């Protein structure tokens, strides 16, 4: 299968740079699958998972807090405020943050911004999915 260069960058650092066979991400208008030779594209992506298939066929998962995905001939770039490799996520911390977010929604006061609280919960759920998918991929390698 053909490969292309992918770079995933957060506000703090470069998370990934290398050759991949494909990537999957969630755009604002739905799921995206990018292969070599894809039509040029610039789109916003939602908080969630960017799944990479490396040139050796192995898969890797990266959590992104949202951002942009740009496709150019033979080069794809993902720009995100926050990006964390799945194997760097801490399941216990994610579950604790998810629980706090749920509690904040349940007990919110009149001045609390529901959309902000729901967004925080959504991001924690996306991190949890990235963590669980990474754990599943690691388990399947054994």
From Swiss-Prot:
Signal peptide: none annotated. It holds the Pfam family ATP-synt_DE_N. InterPro entries: ATP_F1_dsu/esu_C_sf (IPR036794), ATP_synth_F1_dsu/esu (IPR001469), ATP_synth_F1_dsu/esu_N (IPR020546), ATPsynth_dsu/esu_N (IPR036771). One of its GO terms (molecular function) is ATP binding. It is a peripheral membrane protein. Belongs to the ATPase epsilon chain family. Keywords: ATP synthesis, Cell inner membrane, Cell membrane, CF(1), Hydrogen ion transport, Ion transport, Membrane, Transport. It comes from the Bacteria. SUPFAM superfamilies: Epsilon subunit of F1F0-ATP synthase C-terminal domain, Epsilon subunit of F1F0-ATP synthase N-terminal domain. Its main location: membrane. HAMAP family: ATP_synth_epsil_bac. This is ATP synthase epsilon chain. Produces ATP from ADP in the presence of a proton gradient across the membrane. CDD domains: F1-ATPase_delta. It is found in: Cell inner membrane. The gene is atpC.
